[in-house]
Curated annotation (Swiss-Prot):
Gene that specifies this protein: yttA
Induction and repression of expression: Negatively regulated by TnrA under nitrogen-limited conditions.
Transmembrane segments: 4-24, 39-59
Main localization, broad class: membrane
Name the record gives this protein: Uncharacterized membrane protein YttA
Organism: Bacillus subtilis (strain 168)
GO CC terms in record: plasma membrane
Upper classification of the organism: Bacteria, Bacillati, Bacillota, Bacilli, Bacillales
Compositionally skewed regions (Basic and acidic residues) per UniProt: 140-182, 191-202
Amino acid sequence: MEMVLAFLGFLACLIALGYGLYHLVRYVLKKEKRFSKRLFWPLFIGGLVLLFTGAALAEPDTAAANAEKKYSALNAEYKNLTKEHEELEKEYKSVSSEAKKLKDNKEDQDKLEKLKNENSDLKKTQKSLKAEIKELQENQKQLKEDAKTAKAENETLRQDKTKLENQLKETESQTASSHEDTGSSSNNTSKSDETKTADKAEGCNIKGSRNGIYHTPGSTYYDRTTDPAEMFCSVEEAEAAGYRAPKR
């Protein structure tokens, strides 16, 4: 899945760059401006997001695989060194046994000295092998911990991915619900405004014209004022709003 995301991201980026290069060449040669930013930028940015997402998801698996390979190689080397150590142990015991037998034989002093030197060299080699084995054991332990950590990080990333997908679904559901609530609220508000307007029209019949004059029912210009700026329920209310009575 991670490789598919990375491949799709790379392909989208490649198409976007090809599209941009094609229109750049056409602009240079023919001065044509038909480049669509709405097509180029979403395709290019979406490709980068897919590419980086695929690479990020694939990285923990790669790290775990590399750790497993290193662990296998070190384990094989550890077994080889252990085998060599056992062989040297046998050889050391054999040389020690021969040295003990030749110790009382004065005629073989040279051979005894040679065996002592060999024995000393074997001890040094044995000590070096023990140090290497200890180091390999520590490296082996560290690789086990690295592999365990890589697997844990991989599992954490998968859980985060699942959590993000669930959050995305929840957000989409909330968005759809919000649109429905908004539509319902708008309808209720419109009905409320219509009701208020009707009530005002029935009880408040003093018209305020746009030139600052109010007209009461039965006055000369009352019926002629067909588009009042405001409606008032009383003369006091109209005068308080800055309107005056007509001169005639």
